[in-house]
Amino acid sequence: AAAGMLPPVAGAIAQEVMRNIRFWVAGDTPSTSSRTVDAVLTDGDGGTSANHDTTVTVIGVNDVPTITNLSGDSLAYSEGAGAVVIEQGTNAVVADVDSANFDTGTLTASFTAGSDSAEDLLGIRNQGTGAGQIGVSGANVTYEGGTIGTFTGGSAGANLVITLNASATPTAVTALVRNITYQN
């Protein structure tokens, strides 16, 4: 049989082959344009079926965002020492393969065990407004001087929740993750 062609088969086998043709898209950000798949059956004796078109519509799936290189970090803290960044390796990376920004998303930092809600604080280090820097002004969080979100909580046992906007790119949120602080 020629490339892309099956050898002659009985009718029942041909039906089974047709029922098992599958379509898939490789990659995380496929085009959502419709595709047309054309099926033609020949009998090996010169007979050819009519063209049978099927339209395939690809519906994108929202892949989850990721934070890598943060798990396993360990922070040795002396009581009363002031705010210290939690991300000790300075190599955490935030990514989202199918979104250019985290508009309306949130970044939440919370204690999962052993917290003293009367004394433990989660916050955001204010580096400034320069290139690559995270800043804090009131409840606003900035990256390179542009607002990327607002925050609430972080004290009295409340989670630190940063609500992000369209300016919160993966690069900006990576910088933010690297500037979450702990203080007692």
Where are these regions (language model features)?
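Extracellular glycosylation-rich, acidic/polar low-complexity regions of adhesion-
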Residues: 1-184
